[in-house]
């Protein structure tokens, strides 16, 4: 189910990432001791739960919400990052591509999708990776004569960047949408033929975030959270998040094992 991670490769990789973000003045956050319902991703089929101190919680899939929390509470900081563990109860894992428990390196920063793209290109240069070919989701789709990009297309991309994801790909509820209303300001970085960095500009539109929370994955995401944790708890946590004063910001998560493969 899960692979044993080589400590030497892991140390080298996490040190490269830490040094990059620390050089930009980012602060490291410990997120694993923080309980949150909204720490689940957009695919409701992969959420697993545990009971702690008399309440049911989702096994965390991301530290993103806590990094956003820190940036929104401390806007004077350049950014934040964390090393987290993601639990993905994949119903049909693809061997060699999917780990059901894996380490992630996540970051949150000021600026929109243009600043995010620039930073990720700089990060890949810092890591010594090949130059990235950049195109939109539809652009890559036209290249491969495919409406929906699959694993096989990522393998053909090799090293590249996919931008402007259509709504049918179920972008996360707090991702910023483009003015066309049909695509999101989301970027996936493909390294060694696999999606390794998933990132996006965050929304500043409270009403749009509230609406999208209830409609992503055809409403299954919100309904599953209600079923597992109760509507009152879920809505309370959502509304507490939406009380923040939002500003342009972006962030993403890096799959450590996939990055280690790309670097080896």
Functional labels for PLM-detected ranges:
Residues 1-46:
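TRNA-binding/sensing appendages of the translation machinery
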Residues 17, 21-24, 124-131, 217:
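A generic secondary-structure signal for well-formed alpha-helical elements
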Residues 14-18, 30, 63, 84, ...:
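Short, well-ordered alpha-helical packing segments
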Residues 45-114, 118-119, 129-264:
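A translation/RNA-centric and nucleic-acid-associated enzymatic feature enriched
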């Amino acid at each position: 189910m899960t692979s044993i991670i080589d400590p030497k490769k892991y140390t080298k990789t996490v040190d490269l990432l830490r040094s990059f973000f620390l050089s930009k003045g980012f602060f490291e956050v410990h997120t694993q001791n923080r309980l949150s319902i909204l720490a689940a991703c957009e695919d409701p089929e992969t959420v697993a739960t545990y009971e702690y101190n008399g309440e049911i919680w989702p096994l965390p899939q991301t530290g993103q919400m806590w990094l956003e929390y820190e940036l929104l509470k401390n806007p004077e900081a350049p950014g934040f990052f964390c090393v987290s563990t993601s639990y993905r109860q994949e119903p049909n894992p693809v061997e060699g591509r999917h780990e059901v428990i894996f380490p992630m390196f996540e970051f949150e920063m000021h600026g929109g999708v243009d600043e995010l793209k620039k930073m990720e290109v700089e990060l890949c240069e810092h890591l010594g990776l090949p130059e990235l070919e950049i195109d939109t989701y539809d652009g890559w789709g036209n290249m491969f004569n495919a409406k929906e990009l699959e694993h096989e297309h990522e393998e053909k991309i090799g090293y590249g960047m996919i931008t402007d994801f259509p709504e049918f790909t179920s972008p996360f509820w707090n991702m910023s949408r483009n003015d066309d209303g049909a695509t999101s300001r989301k970027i996936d970085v493909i390294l060694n033929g696999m999606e390794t960095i998933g990132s996006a500009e965050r929304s500043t539109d409270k009403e749009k975030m509230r609406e999208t929370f209830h409609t992503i994955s055809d409403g299954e995401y919100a309904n599953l959270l209600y079923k597992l944790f109760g509507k009152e708890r879920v809505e309370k946590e959502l509304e507490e998040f939406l009380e923040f004063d939002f500003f342009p910001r972006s962030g993403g998560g890096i799959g450590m094992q996939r990055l280690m493969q790309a670097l080896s």
